[in-house]
């Protein structure tokens, strides 16, 4: 996706808006669909807030679907270009066999406990820090971890959104 200016975003038709921002939240174009009615945006932060509000105002089931749309970290599966780049920046695409097995075990434990994959904004992190966060967060209460995971999703979306805009 090429960089956009805010002026261009405000002129997009509804379908083009969803095409441009439908993957900001992993496999969840409904977020962009709900946020588009808030146009025109006076700033990128206003767009970010509209998208975040769309998630926060959604039902818990819809939020759970959003969390479940994220790939397991360190998995060697097909994922969106954005997820692939984020995981590569954290060296999760080149784990040793031992690290890979550790991530598989942690992912399985976490998913069994919470019913959704571990979500973390991993851009420019490292495998050891990510594994430590997984081990720490698996001890959270269900409500604390659900909130933490949603906050991480918002951070990921914010980073992705920033990449879409050129300086005006």
UniProtKB/Swiss-Prot annotation:
Residues 70-93 are annotated as: Disordered. Substrate binds at residues 71, 83-87, 118-122. It catalyses: 5-hydroxy-2-oxo-4-ureido-2,5-dihydro-1H-imidazole-5-carboxylate + H(+) = (S)-allantoin + CO2. GO terms for biological process: allantoin metabolic process; purine nucleobase metabolic process; urate catabolic process. Coiled coil: none annotated. SUPFAM superfamilies: UraD-Like. GO terms for molecular function: 2-oxo-4-hydroxy-4-carboxy-5-ureidoimidazoline decarboxylase activity; oxidoreductase activity. Residues 70-79 have a biased composition (Basic and acidic residues). The active site is at residue 70. It holds the Pfam family OHCU_decarbox. Belongs to the OHCU decarboxylase family. Catalyzes the stereoselective decarboxylation of 2-oxo-4-hydroxy-4-carboxy-5-ureidoimidazoline (OHCU) to (S)-allantoin. This is 2-oxo-4-hydroxy-4-carboxy-5-ureidoimidazoline decarboxylase.
């Amino acid at each position: 996706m090429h960089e956009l200016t805010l002026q261009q975003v405000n002129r997009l038709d509804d379908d083009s808006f969803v095409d441009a921002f439908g993957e900001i939240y992993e496999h969840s174009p409904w977020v962009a669909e709900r946020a588009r009615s808030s146009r025109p945006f006076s700033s990128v932060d206003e767009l970010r807030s509209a998208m975040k509000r769309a998630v926060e105002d959604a039902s818990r089931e819809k939020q759970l679907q959003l969390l479940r749309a994220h790939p397991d970290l360190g998995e060697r599966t097909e994922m969106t270009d954005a997820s692939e780049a984020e995981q590569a920046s954290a060296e999760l695409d080149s784990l040793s066999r031992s690290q890979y097995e550790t991530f598989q075990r942690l992912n399985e434990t976490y998913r069994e406990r919470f019913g959704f994959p571990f979500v973390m904004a991993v851009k420019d992190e490292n495998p050891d820090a990510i594994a430590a966060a997984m081990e720490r967060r698996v001890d959270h209460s269900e409500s604390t971890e659900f909130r933490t995971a949603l906050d991480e999703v918002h951070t990921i979306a914010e980073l992705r959104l920033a990449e879409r805009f050129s300086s005006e």
